[in-house]
Swiss-Prot record:
Gene3D superfamilies: 3.30.465.10. It comes from Penicillium expansum (Blue mold rot fungus). Glycans are attached at residues 47, 101, 125, 179, 341, 374, 380, 421, 445, 480. Induction: Expression is correlated with the production of patulin. Expression is positively regulated by the secondary metabolism regulator laeA. Expression is strongly decreased with increased sucrose concentrations. This decrease is lost in the presence of malic acid. Expression is increased with pH changes from 2.5 to 3.5 in the presence of a limiting concentration of sucrose, 50 mM. Natural phenols present in apple fruits such as chlorogenic acid or the flavonoid epicatechin modulate patulin biosynthesis. The lineage of its organism: Eukaryota, Fungi, Dikarya, Ascomycota, Pezizomycotina. It comes from the Eukaryota. GO terms for cellular component: fungal-type vacuole lumen; vacuole. The gene is patO. This is FAD-linked oxidoreductase patO. InterPro entries: BBE, FAD-bd_PCMH, FAD-bd_PCMH-like_sf, FAD-bd_PCMH_sub2, FAD-linked_Oxidoreductases_BP, Oxid_FAD_bind_N. Keywords: FAD, Flavoprotein, Glycoprotein, Oxidoreductase, Signal, Vacuole.
Length: 571
């Protein structure tokens, strides 16, 4: 499939970009209140040019603050605040408490002024690629920061920015199942536009007797940063990462060109978008990915407690779990284990094409280890006739589906670590959890033995990983911001380095990481970075697209008040 744009529109856009390049000489993007900021009449004319699709940001938490306070609305907001559906239906709301910075929080005092802070100033509720083109052009002509957003599932603040104009893709809801034919793949596929979420595609695929490699969180959008950043799934040990399934992209680049990117058309852009991160190479309108026939699935939930902290039996059991984990992932399983200093919760272990009997046999050696340690546990093994049924039973109800305010860090841990130095991993888990950190280990196998010969820009450390780890510490609603920032700094300087010492070369999944990661280029992109930067320069020569820790972001810096300025070059 190849999309075409009329030559007159394309020519006008390219000429416009060339003409405005001189207008981008300012070292900083324009902000509200600047003399270069568009007037209300300018915004009105732009709104007319895009069919009235401009959204003026009204902060979601506004009803909880004077002079807009409404008790009933505020109470309802507080009840719904941790539900992602509340935020992903907004063009501007920020799920991450660290990024939102209490600028308009439903849980801060009513008397505290409600400001936009890091929220975008305006958004374009896009309905077509032409809306992308028009918005890119306007942002370039007016030297305005531009960001891309679907749902706002974003720990690092990539999809928002103070004084920014957002391309909001949330209304683009098309799903087309097709038989795809190319030199590289022939078989079932699905084309999804940029606003699709798991809540849309999962039931649609199920009705067709198919599955896709999508996220564990149902409200995440598979077309944006999820797949563009790699994207792990409960089906990853069976099929690979989400980025491994991409057949082609439809994308508007920084020159306003609507392009198809596949292994044969603009292959460098295809390679970059498939794992090199979102928000920086262009605005994706649609993606076409592989689909697979559905199958029966068995799910496991296993829990035990640290009832005797004076002994080391609990962490011995954790060590045994990690020792057995490669057996589960080699069988096509994907495991999510949450470990604190008081409890271990596996919820769930997903085993495609396994029966309950086969699953219990697979778990047998680990359960025997627990018996020998005299550790009591609860175990539930659930068979489902389809992956969708399994998802709705064991994954969708999981508390991790809620907005999780926390300090985040992460690391990919290689299989070699478990096989050779599992005791060091156990010591690290014990040290981290003793400090109040939750260790979430997502066990999977996306090596070449699973994916085959894949060509994309996924961080190489994924291919040798036994698990991707997320570290979190609690961020209660209404918590003291200063105290939370202290914990965030500890994540950067103390807790993440514990895992880095275990696997200094592996890197980290960019979408579940410390936003303050010091060596982010190496950690998130590895040896791919220089090639990704060259592709960024080719398709976005004016550096229209910026996102925190995205490729090319080192050329910019966020200054006081959120102003985005060109970074000072070091000699």
């Amino acid at each position: 499939m190849r999309l075409h744009q009329s030559p007159p529109r394309l020519l006008v856009c390219i000429l416009s970009v060339l003409q405005v390049s001189a207008g981008l000489s300012s070292n900083c993007r324009c902000m509200p209140g600047d003399s270069c900021w568009p007037s209300l009449n300018d915004w009105a004319r732009f709104n007319t040019s895009i069919g009235g699709r401009l959204v003026d940001t009204q902060p979601l938490g506004q009803p909880c603050h004077d002079p807009f306070y409404t008790a009933s609305e505020c109470n309802e907001l507080k009840q719904q605040w941790t539900h992602p559906e509340l935020h992903d239906a907004s063009s501007s709301s920020i799920m991450s408490a660290a990024v939102a910075n209490e600028t308009c929080d439903a849980f801060t005092p009513r008397s505290k002024p409600c400001t936009l802070g890091a929220m975008v100033r305006y958004a374009v509720n896009a309905s077509s690629p032409d809306d992308f083109v028009q918005t890119i052009r306007f942002s370039q002509e007016r030297n305005i920061r531009l960001v891309i957003r679907n749902t706002g599932h974003d720990y690092a603040g990539k999809s928002t920015g103070a004084g920014a104009l957002s391309i909001w893709t949330h209304s683009l809801k098309e799903i087309d199942f097709l038989n795809y034919t190319s030199a590289h793949y022939t078989g079932p596929a699905v084309r999804m536009t940029a606003g699709i979420q798991g809540t849309d595609i999962n039931p649609a695929a199920h009705k067709k007797g198919l599955v896709i490699v999508g996220g564990e969180c149902a409200t995440v959008g598979p077309v944006g940063g999820f797949t563009q950043g790699g994207g792990h799934s409960a089906l990853s040990s069976r099929f690979g990462l989400a980025a491994d399934q991409v057949l082609e992209w439809e994308v508007v680049d920084g020159m306003g060109r609507l392009l198809t990117a596949s292994p044969t058309q603009n292959p460098d852009l295809y390679w970059a978008l498939s794992g090199g991160g979102g928000g920086t190479f262009g605005v994706v309108y649609a993606v076409t990915v592989k689909t697979f026939p559905d199958f029966a699935v068995t799910g496991v939930v296993l829990q035990f407690e640290n009832i005797d902290p004076s002994s080391n039996r609990f962490f011995e059991a954790v060590g045994h779990y990690h020792r057995h984990l490669p057996t589960y992932t080699s069988a096509g399983g994907m495991a999510i284990a949450q470990i604190t200093n008081s409890s271990f919760l596996l919820t769930p272990l997903t085993l495609p094409a396994y029966t309950a009997a086969a699953t219990k046999k697979l778990l047998g050696p680990f359960l025997q280890d627990l018996h020998q340690l005299n550790i009591s546990y609860t175990l539930n093994v659930t068979e489902s006739a389809s992956y969708f049924q399994h998802y709705m039973k064991l994954i969708e109800p999981n508390p991790t589906q809620l907005v999780q305010n926390a300090q985040y860090g992460g690391r990919l841990l290689p299989l070699d670590l478990i096989e050779r130095n599992n005791s060091q991993l156990t010591d690290a888990v014990q040290k981290l959890t003793a400090d109040g950190v939750t260790f979430v280990g997502i066990g999977l196998n996306v090596s070449s033995s699973v994916t085959g010969d894949i060509w994309n820009s996924v961080l190489p450390g994924w291919r040798t990983a036994a698990m991707t780890v997320i570290l979190t510490t609690s961020w209660p609603l209404g918590a003291n911001l200063t105290k939370m920032k202290i914990l965030a700094d500890k994540m950067t300087t103390k807790w993440v380095p514990i895992l880095t010492a275990l696997s200094p070369e592996s890197g980290c999944y960019m979408s579940e990481a410390d936003p303050q990661q010091p060596d982010w280029k190496q950690t998130f992109y590895g040896r791919n970075y220089d090639s990704l930067y060259a592709i960024k320069t080719k398709y976005d020569p004016l550096q229209t697209f910026y996102a925190t820790t995205a490729v090319g972001s080192e050329d910019w810096q966020v200054e006081a008040g959120g102003r985005l300025c060109q970074a000072t070059r070091k000699n």
